[in-house]
């Protein structure tokens, strides 16, 4: 691996499999992180990305605040983080924390830092990756399982306060928060155990069904509610936008529970309830399915797992074809009925008789879903009622227009909120939290 020491987030890192690949890869690393020192590392395959959270003061004290697992990555950038680490043996994990503390002391580090490792499940061994000299965006994972406010600790450390006088760290070691007696931070047994398990998911403006290709554009709506088990934040809001030069991540969700499986379930619920509508695509549906896979639940994935799934073109499940067709026909027909109504009223406002060709009661919607063409006859049977006909079969639905431009469609006793977004390749439908595309018939 060729890696720029100033790089991060997937930038400034390349894998080379032969000497012939080195010159070109080296130039790419140089171009992505200009001026950075570049070093070569042995490639560790089938590894987990584990990291230890550190706090170090001005007096030579270093405390490790548990560990995190950040192995679910695409293009070397984290997508899912969790803590504490569950895949490594406790003795090995304790040794990793000890080495991390020793490293920080050896360079007289002060502040919050993360020491990152590549861990081999087969060998129960690990390799040093890097010391990240900053507070990382996934720090709430550690805060939730430890009760330690890491940014607040940074402020106190900068003021010269020793670690053993910081109330949160004293609580972590079972001490009186108001006390000042010394603490042996090398004695891991004195530290309270982690409080439950936390799963974190980065929300990115990427099309997960197209190799996590970045997307940009306006955001009409972001709907997410925090609760005692789930917390999240977003760097933009409805009415804002993600531009093409920004980092793809614009949100982060965290779910906590007593066990790892319960935390996964809490995150699944949170992702299903998350609603993001606009020109961008997001990874939320994809990750929701990803964390329910056998490999993730079984804790047997590695850092190359997600990239392999992308290469194998594993995509998210789409809405049932019949629901996509019905909702697609409803969206297309309501658009045409509204256009005809405007045209009809235009004639009346001019004192003219509207021509007979303007029908506000029937139309035909034709589109392609999953490479299949559908031609649906639509008849308006009431102010909010449509009858759809396809291949001799018919279905009645109730359609109500929403204030935000969406439709509330009632079908067979179930309600579906549907929004649409026009794109160069067709119409993107958001049915609840699932997405499908309506394409025009391809030219021969």
Named regions from a protein language model:
Residues 2, 15-45, 75-83, 89-90, ...:
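Conserved ATP-binding module of the ATP-grasp superfamily
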Residues 13-14, 42, 88, 249-258:
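Short, well-ordered beta-strand elements within core beta-sheets of diverse protein domains
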Residues 17-18, 56-61, 120-123, 226, ...:
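Short acidic-glycine loop/turn motifs at beta-strand connectors
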Residues 56-98, 133-156:
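ATP-dependent carboxylate/phosphate-activation module, predominantly the ATP-grasp catalytic core
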Residues 240, 435-444:
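Short beta-strand-turn/beta-hairpin segments enriched in glycine/proline and small hydrophobics
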């Amino acid at each position: 691996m060729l890696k720029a020491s100033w790089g991060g987030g997937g930038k400034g890192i390349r894998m080379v499999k032969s000497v012939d690949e080195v010159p070109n890869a080296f130039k790419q690393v140089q171009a992505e992180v200009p001026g950075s020192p570049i070093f070569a590392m042995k490639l560790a395959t089938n590894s987990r990305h584990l990291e230890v959270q550190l706090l170090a003061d001005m007096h030579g004290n270093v405390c490790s605040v548990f560990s995190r697992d950040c192995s679910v990555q695409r293009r070397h950038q984290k997508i899912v983080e969790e803590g504490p680490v569950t895949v490594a043996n406790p003795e090995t994990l304790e040794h990793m924390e000890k080495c991390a503390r020793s490293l920080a002391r050896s360079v007289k580090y002060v502040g919050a830092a993360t020491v990152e490792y590549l861990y081999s499940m087969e060998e129960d061994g690990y390799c040093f990756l890097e010391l990240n000299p900053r507070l990382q965006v996934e720090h709430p994972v550690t805060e939730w399982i430890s009760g330690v406010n890491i940014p607040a600790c940074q402020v106190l450390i900068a003021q010269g306060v020793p670690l053993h006088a910081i109330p949160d760290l004293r609580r972590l070691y079972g001490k009186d928060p108001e006390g000042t007696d010394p603490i042996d931070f090398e004695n891991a047994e004195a530290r309270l155990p982690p409080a439950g398990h936390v799963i974190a998911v980065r929300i990115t403006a990427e099309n997960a069904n197209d190799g996590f290709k970045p997307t940009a554009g306006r955001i009409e709506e972001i709907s997410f509610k925090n609760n005692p088990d789930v917390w999240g934040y977003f760097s933009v809001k409805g009415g804002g936008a993600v531009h093409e030069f920004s980092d793809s991540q614009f949100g982060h969700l965290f779910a906590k529970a007593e066990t790892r499986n319960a935390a996964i379930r809490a995150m699944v619920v949170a992702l299903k309830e998350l609603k993001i509508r606009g020109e961008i695509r997001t990874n939320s549906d994809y990750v929701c399915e990803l964390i329910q896979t056998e490999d993730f639940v079984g804790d047997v994935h590695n850092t190359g797992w997600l990239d392999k799934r992308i290469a194998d073109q594993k995509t998210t499940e789409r809405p049932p074809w019949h629901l996509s067709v019905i909702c697609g026909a409803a969206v297309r027909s309501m658009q045409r009925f509204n256009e005809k109504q405007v045209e009809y009223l235009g004639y009346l406002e001019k004192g003219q008789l509207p021509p007979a060709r303007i029908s506000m009661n029937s139309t035909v919607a034709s589109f392609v879903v999953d490479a299949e063409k559908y031609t649906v006859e639509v008849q308006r049977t009431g102010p909010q009622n449509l009858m759809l006909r396809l291949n001799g079969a018919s279905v009645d639905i109730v359609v109500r227009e929403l204030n935000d431009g969406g439709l509330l469609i009632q079908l067979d006793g179930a309600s579906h909120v549907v929004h649409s977004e026009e794109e160069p390749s067709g119409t993107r439908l958001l049915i609840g939290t699932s997405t499908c595309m309506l394409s025009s018939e391809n030219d021969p």
